[in-house]
C-alpha cells in the first residue's frame, strides 16, 4: 500500500512535511499532479491512480484549488469513499469549502472546524484508542498549541464516529468507517518539520503537529511501517560503590522497592572502584540479576574526562576502564554491560568515535550534546531509539524521575526509545519519587521489559515487513539479536544507519557474515530457521594510539577526587549547610 498525495503545480508545504514523516516511518509515497483541464474529477483520479490499495491524502486547500467553488462535488465524495480503503483529511481551514468537505465525507457526523479557546488547555486521548494511539491511550496532558490546534464541531453523535483525541470534549482527531473507506480526520493546521530544532521542548509543544499524523499513518500501514519491536526500561543509578550503604542508598531497601514496584536498576559503576566492592552486595547482585546490573561510568570519574578531544588519551582511558571491569568480573562474578554513562554528562565527538571502535553497544546521557558543541536536537533525532548524529555512534537519552512524566514515557514507547531513568543516591532520601516514576512507566506501558541497560540498548530496534515477506530490522546498538518466532523459515534484512563502516560483522560473536556498506549505512541479509535467534555484532578496527602511562599526578588526582566524593555523598550530604559550603569550595578549586 502507498500514501497518495495529490498536488497542484507543486506539493503544498504541509503535504511535503507529511510525505517526509511518512517516509521517515518507512512508508512508500506517491505524489500525483492534478490537471485542471482534465474534465470530471473522479474519472481523472481513476486514470491517474491505478492503485486500489492506497491511502489518499485530502488537503482541502489543494482540492479547492483544483476544483474551484465552495463545495465538494457529491460525485467526487462518493468516488473517494468507494475507491480508496483509507482517506486522510488534514489541515482543514475555516473556509466554506472545508466545511462542505468535512460534512459530506463524515455524513454529517462532523462539521466545520473552529479554533480553540484559551481555557481549552488539555489533550484527552481516548482510553479505547490503544490500537491507534498506542501508549498515549488514556492520557490527558497539555498545554495545547493555540497556534496550531482546532477542533471539529459535531453534527450528530454515533457509535461509528471514533473520537480519538479531544480538546474540551470536541474531537481533534477522529476516525469513521464509511462504505469501503476508513476516513481519518485531523483538525491541526500544520504538520511538524522533522528537521526543525526542538531542543528540550516538552512533548506538548509539538504533539499535535506530529503524533496524530504518525498514529494515523502507523495504523493505516500496519506492519509495512517502522514500529518498535518491544519496549525496554531501566533505572540508572550513578556513582555508588557496591556496599550496603552509599549516601542515602541502601541496597537491601532498593531491592525491596524494586520487587514492590517492579523495576530494574543498573548501577553506573566507576571502574576506578573495581577493588572495593563488598562480597555481601556482589552476592546480592548475582542472586538478583533480574533486578541489578552494572554498566560503565567513565573510568576515574574525574572532571569531564570523556569531554577530551585527545583521541589517544580517550583510547587509553577506555582501555584502562575495560581492564578494570574485567578484573572486577573475576573478583565478583558480575558482568558489566558495554554501555557508557558519561561522568557529569560531559562528552566529546572524539569520545563517541573511540567508544565505537571499542565496540561498545552505545552511550547513555542526560545531556544531549557534546560539551564543546551545544547543538539543538531535531524531531528526527529524538523520534527514534537513539541519536545518531555524533560520529554515527548511538546516544540513548535519559531523564530523572521528576521529568519522566506520562507523556514523555508514551513518546519514548511510541518511537521505540528505551525509557531510561537517571538518579543518584540522594533520591533515596525520598524514594517515593523514583517509585512513582516506575509506576508511571508500568501504567503507561504495562508490557515494558525491565532489564539491564545493555539489553535495553541492544533490543531497542524498529521492524517492518514488506509485501515480499521480508522482515526488516533497523538496529541502533552495536549488537542486535534477531528472532524468528514463527513456525517457518523467514528472510530478514538488517540495517544500521551508520556512516562509519565496520571491519566485519559477526554472527553469534564468532562467525563472520557477508554485509554491504554504503553512504546510507550497513546492510545484511539472513535466513533464520523457525524458532531460532541470531546475534549480529559490528566489529570495528581501532586506529587510535595509546597515551601511555597517565602519570602519578593524574592518578593521585583521581584517587583524591573519589575519596572526597564519597565523603560528600556519605556524610556531607546528610548535613545540608555543610554540603552547600563544600560545593562552594569545590567550585572555587581548579579542575
Regions found by a protein language model. Give the residues of each.
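C-terminal domain-boundary segment and adjacent tail
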Residues: 218-221, 225-229, 253-273, 360-379, ...
Amino acid at each position: 500500500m502507498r500514501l497518495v498525495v495529490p498536488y497542484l503545480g507543486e506539493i503544498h508545504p504541509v503535504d511535503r512535511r507529511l510525505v517526509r514523516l511518512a517516509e521517515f516511518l518507512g512508508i512508500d509515497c506517491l505524489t500525483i499532479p492534478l490537471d485542471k483541464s482534465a474534465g470530471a474529477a473522479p474519472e481523472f483520479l481513476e486514470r491517474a491512480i491505478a492503485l486500489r490499495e492506497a491511502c489518499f491524502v485530502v488537503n482541502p486547500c489543494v482540492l479547492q484549488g483544483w476544483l474551484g467553488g465552495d463545495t465538494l462535488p457529491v460525485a467526487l465524495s462518493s468516488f473517494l469513499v468507494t475507491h480508496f480503503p483509507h482517506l486522510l483529511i488534514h489541515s482543514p481551514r475555516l473556509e466554506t469549502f472545508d466545511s462542505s468537505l468535512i460534512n459530506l465525507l463524515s455524513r454529517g457526523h462532523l462539521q466545520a472546524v473552529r479554533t480553540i479557546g484559551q481555557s481549552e488547555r488539555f489533550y484527552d486521548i481516548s482510553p479505547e484508542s490503544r490500537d491507534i494511539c498506542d501508549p498515549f491511550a488514556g492520557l490527558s496532558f497539555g498545554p495545547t498549541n493555540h497556534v496550531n490546534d482546532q477542533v471539529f464541531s459535531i453534527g450528530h453523535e454515533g457509535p461509528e464516529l471514533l473520537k480519538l483525541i479531544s480538546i474540551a470534549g470536541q474531537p481533534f482527531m477522529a476516525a469513521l468507517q464509511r462504505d469501503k473507506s476508513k476516513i481519518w480526520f485531523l483538525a491541526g493546521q500544520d504538520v511538524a518539520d522533522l528537521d526543525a530544532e526542538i531542543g528540550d521542548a516538552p512533548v506538548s509543544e509539538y504533539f499535535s503537529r506530529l503524533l496524530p499524523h504518525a498514529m494515523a499513518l502507523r495504523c493505516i500501514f500496519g506492519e509495512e511501517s517502522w514500529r518498535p519491536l518491544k519496549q525496554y526500561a531501566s533505572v540508572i543509578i550513578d556513582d555508588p560503590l557496591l556496599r550496603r550503604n552509599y549516601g542515602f542508598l541502601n541496597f537491601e531497601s532498593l531491592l525491596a522497592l524494586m520487587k514492590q514496584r517492579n523495576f530494574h536498576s543498573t548501577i553506573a559503576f566507576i571502574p576506578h572502584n573495581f577493588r572495593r566492592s563488598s562480597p555481601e552486595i556482589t552476592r546480592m547482585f548475582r542472586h538478583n540479576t533480574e533486578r541489578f546490573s552494572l554498566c560503565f561510568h567513565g573510568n576515574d570519574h574525574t572532571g569531564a574526562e570523556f569531554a577530551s578531544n585527545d583521541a589517544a588519551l580517550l583510547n587509553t582511558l577506555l582501555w584502562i576502564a575495560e581492564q578494570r571491569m574485567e578484573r572486577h568480573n573475576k573478583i565478583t562474578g558480575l558482568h558489566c554491560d558495554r554501555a557508557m554513562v558519561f561522568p557529569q554528562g560531559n562528552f566529546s565527538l572524539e569520545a563517541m568515535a573511540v567508544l565505537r571502535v571499542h565496540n561498545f553497544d552505545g552511550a547513555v546521557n542526560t545531556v544531549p550534546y557534546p560539551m564543546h558543541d551545544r547543538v539543538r536536537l531535531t524531531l528526527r533525532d529524538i523520534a527514534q531509539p537513539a541519536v545518531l548524529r555524533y560520529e554515527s555512534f548511538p546516544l540513548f537519552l535519559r531523564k530523572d524521575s521528576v521529568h519522566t512524566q506520562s507523556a514523555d514515557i508514551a513518546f519514548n514507547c511510541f518511537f521505540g526509545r528505551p525509557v531510561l531513568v537517571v538518579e543518584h543516591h540522594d533520591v533515596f532520601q525520598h524514594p517515593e519519587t523514583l517509585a512513582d516514576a516506575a509506576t508511571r512507566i508500568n501504567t503507561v506501558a504495562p508490557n515494558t521489559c525491565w532489564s539491564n541497560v545493555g539489553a535495553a540498548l541492544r533490543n531497542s530496534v524498529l521492524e517492518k515487513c514488506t509485501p515480499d515477506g521480508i522482515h526488516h530490522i533497523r538496529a541502533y546498538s552495536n549488537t542486535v539479536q534477531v528472532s524468528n518466532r514463527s513456525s517457518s523459515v523467514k528472510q530478514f534484512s538488517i540495517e544500521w544507519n551508520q556512516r562509519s563502516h565496520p571491519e566485519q560483522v559477526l554472527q553469534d560473536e564468532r562467525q563472520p557474515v557477508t554485509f554491504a556498506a554504503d553512504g546510507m549505512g550497513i546492510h545484511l541479509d539472513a535466513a533464520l530457521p523457525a524458532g531460532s535467534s541470531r546475534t549480529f555484532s559490528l566489529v570495528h578496527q581501532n586506529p587510535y594510539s595509546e597515551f601511555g602511562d597517565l602519570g602519578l599526578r593524574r592518578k593521585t588526582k583521581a584517587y583524591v577526587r573519589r575519596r572526597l566524593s564519597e565523603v560528600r555523598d556519605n556524610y556531607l550530604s546528610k548535613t545540608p549547610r555543610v554540603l552547600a559550603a563544600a560545593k562552594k569550595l569545590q567550585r572555587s578549586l581548579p579542575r
